[in-house]
């Protein structure tokens, strides 16, 4: 935008100026490069440049077996890895025509919700930091550490878990873990109340986020929003309710919905989602029963170590599984899960071989990021920071 000013008999042309926001900026949440066209401090245009974390994940998966492809999903949205694995595991199960055992489904549902809380803890606390509040991020990391210990207990890894598998989960829950999780579910709601008490009615926080980056329900649908971002705009769309998978049909929970579609509502929706996730985890703990944790077809899941020491067939199954992998019948499926950020989908095509013919990943943040021009228009430069924070972007999945 340029304007003409008449000054002392001269006509002076004043042009807007463009600046780079990121990719080195700490509030860019990774490697976002945002070219902002400013009129003074007012954002006239926001042009996101992506691809700085592109690793060719979709193409790499075409050269791996289905089992080898799974760990790539941990590295997409590396803040909520088990939810990404969940989508690929369900898609592969659909093509194979198998269903994970009851116990495995309850474990996966429980850890998907633990992962949701992990994600929201990081987002809400760093989002508050973007707005100038330093205390929540110090509190939040202490709580996240407890949840990462649960990740480590079942998978051996804090972040890149590689725990969900087509047909179930990699290992059973270690002894005593359910008691530790149950103890944590009793204490964690008090932390949510403390954090919400620090921010929800804080006058300074509300000045930063209320009526900033508003999206109407029509705009949210048009831009392909999902997850907390679309629910903050007043649309109660949640795949766990509308298209339940694993054990979500057997648990009771509410879908929090906002009214104004602004940064404040996106914050409130995530706070309430953490409360609902604790509620789901409690129900999972009460309903998990003893049983197998993976399908008993050893052409798909590895046989137990003890059986391999006794049976030649078990040894052959293990060797074939880890050298060649299993062959998936020809077909295609689109399978989506309600990840902490929104709808994370996998379009998986099999040509009957042991490798995916095509694996198209539908990232959540990609749709949200493209709307930033609309959301930041005519807001101040400082508001662009909280808008980015409210979208909960992770560039591992945006760039793939």
UniProtKB/Swiss-Prot annotation:
Localization, UniProt: Cell inner membrane
UniProt key word Cell inner membrane: yes
A molecular function GO annotation: NAD binding
Keywords assigned by UniProt, alphabetized: Cell inner membrane, Cell membrane, Membrane, NAD, Quinone, Translocase, Transport, Ubiquinone
NCBIfam families: NuoD (TIGR01962), PRK06075.1 (NF004739)
Protein name, entry field: NADH-quinone oxidoreductase subunit D
Family assignment from sequence similarity: Belongs to the complex I 49 kDa subunit family.
Membrane topology: Peripheral membrane protein
Lineage top rank: taxon: Bacteria
Natural source organism: Granulibacter bethesdensis (strain ATCC BAA-1260 / CGDNIH1)
Assembly notes: NDH-1 is composed of 14 different subunits. Subunits NuoB, C, D, E, F, and G constitute the peripheral sector of the complex.
Purpose of the protein: NDH-1 shuttles electrons from NADH, via FMN and iron-sulfur (Fe-S) centers, to quinones in the respiratory chain. The immediate electron acceptor for the enzyme in this species is believed to be ubiquinone. Couples the redox reaction to proton translocation (for every two electrons transferred, four hydrogen ions are translocated across the cytoplasmic membrane), and thus conserves the redox energy in a proton gradient.
Gene: nuoD
One Pfam family it belongs to: Complex1_49kDa
EC number from the UniProt entry: 7.1.1.-
Catalytic activities: a quinone + NADH + 5 H(+)(in) = a quinol + NAD(+) + 4 H(+)(out)
HAMAP family cross-referenced by the UniProt entry: NDH1_NuoD (MF_01358)
InterPro entries recorded: NADH_Q_OxRdtase_suD, NADH_UbQ_OxRdtase_49kDa_CS, NDH1_su_D/H, NiFe-Hase_large
Gene Ontology CC annotation, any one: plasma membrane
């Amino acid at each position: 935008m340029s304007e003409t000013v008449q000054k002392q008999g001269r006509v002076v042309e004043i042009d807007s100026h463009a600046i780079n926001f990121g990719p080195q900026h700490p509030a860019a949440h990774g490697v976002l490069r945002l070219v902002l066209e400013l009129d003074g401090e007012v954002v006239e245009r926001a042009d996101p440049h992506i691809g700085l974390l592109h690793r060719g994940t979709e193409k790499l998966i075409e050269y791996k077996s289905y089992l080898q492809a799974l760990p790539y999903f941990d590295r997409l949205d590396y803040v909520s890895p088990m939810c990404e694995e969940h989508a690929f595991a369900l898609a592969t199960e659909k093509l194979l025509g198998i269903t994970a055992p009851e116990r495995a489904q309850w474990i996966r549902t429980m850890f998907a919700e633990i992962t949701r809380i992990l994600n929201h803890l990081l987002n809400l606390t760093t989002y508050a930091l973007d707005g100038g509040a330093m205390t929540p991020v110090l509190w939040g990391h202490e709580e996240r550490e407890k949840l990462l210990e649960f990740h480590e207990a079942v998978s051996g890894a804090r972040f890149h878990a590689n725990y969900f598998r087509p047909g179930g989960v990699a290992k059973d829950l270690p002894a005593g873990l359910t008691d530790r999780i149950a103890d944590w579910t009793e204490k964690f709601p008090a932390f949510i109340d403390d954090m919400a008490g620090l921010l929800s009615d804080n006058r300074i926080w509300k000045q930063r986020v209320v009526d900033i980056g508003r999206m109407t329900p029509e705009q949210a649908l048009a831009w392909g929003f999902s997850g907390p971002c679309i629910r903050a705009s007043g649309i109660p769309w949640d795949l766990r309710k509308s298209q339940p998978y694993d054990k979500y049909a057997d648990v009771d929970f509410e879908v929090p919905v906002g009214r104004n579609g602004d940064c404040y509502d996106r914050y409130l929706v995530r706070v309430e989602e953490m409360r609902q996730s604790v509620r789901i985890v409690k129900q999972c703990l009460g309903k998990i029963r003893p049983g197998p944790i993976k399908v008993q077809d050893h052409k798909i899941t590895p046989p137990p170590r003890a059986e391999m020491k006794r049976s030649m067939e078990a040894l052959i199954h293990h060797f074939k599984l880890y050298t060649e992998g299993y062959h998936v019948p020809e077909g295609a499926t689109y399978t989506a899960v309600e990840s902490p950020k929104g709808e994370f989908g996998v379009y998986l095509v099999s040509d009957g071989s042991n490798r995916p013919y095509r694996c198209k990943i539908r990232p959540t943040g990609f749709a949200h990021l493209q709307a930033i021009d609309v959301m930041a228009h005519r807001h101040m430069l400082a508001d662009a920071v909280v808008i980015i924070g409210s979208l909960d972007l992770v560039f591992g999945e945006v760039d793939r």
